[in-house]
Curated annotation (Swiss-Prot):
Organism: Pectobacterium carotovorum subsp. carotovorum
UniProt name for this protein: DNA-binding protein RdgB
Function description: Regulates pectin lyase production in response to DNA damage.
UniProt cross-references to InterPro entries, sorted A to Z: c-mor_Regulatory_Protein, Homeodomain-like_sf, Mor_transcription_activator
GO molecular function: DNA binding
Family classification: Belongs to the c/mor transcriptional regulatory family.
């Protein structure tokens, strides 16, 4: 199926997903737009049809993933004295900053202990 045919006859989810893939490929690589479209439409869409065809697919909102990314960013910015500034910047409570720092320190310590064992 050519690209225009795929856009007009492809299932809506696959068409939209393949366009997002093409846009992402264009953004993160130096591929020309036509090649990026080929990757998204021809390769990715066909692969998804083969792998997940006929299945109901659920895409989580990624709330816990985004929160863990935010927590890591907070911990990296933490300097021992900027609890309040971080709470304001990330729109969380001061207690939440303390909890994040405590949790991240514990995880860091466990990781060090496992590498030394």
């Amino acid at each position: 199926m050519t690209e225009p045919q795929f856009r007009s006859k492809g299932p809506e989810l696959l068409v939209e997903l393949s366009q997002h893939v093409a846009d992402t490929v264009k953004t993160v690589t130096e591929l020309d737009p036509q090649t990026a479209e080929l990757v998204g439409n021809a390769r990715f869409a066909k692969h998804m049809m083969t792998v997940w065809g006929g299945q109901n697919v659920y895409f989580p909102m990624g709330i816990s993933w985004r929160a863990s990314q935010r927590d890591l960013q907070i911990y990296e910015e933490f300097d021992g004295r900027n609890h309040s500034a971080l709470a304001k910047k990330y729109n969380v409570s001061l207690q939440w900053i303390y909890k994040i720092v405590r949790t991240m320190r514990k995880e860091e310590l466990l990781a060090k202990q496992h590498t030394q064992a």
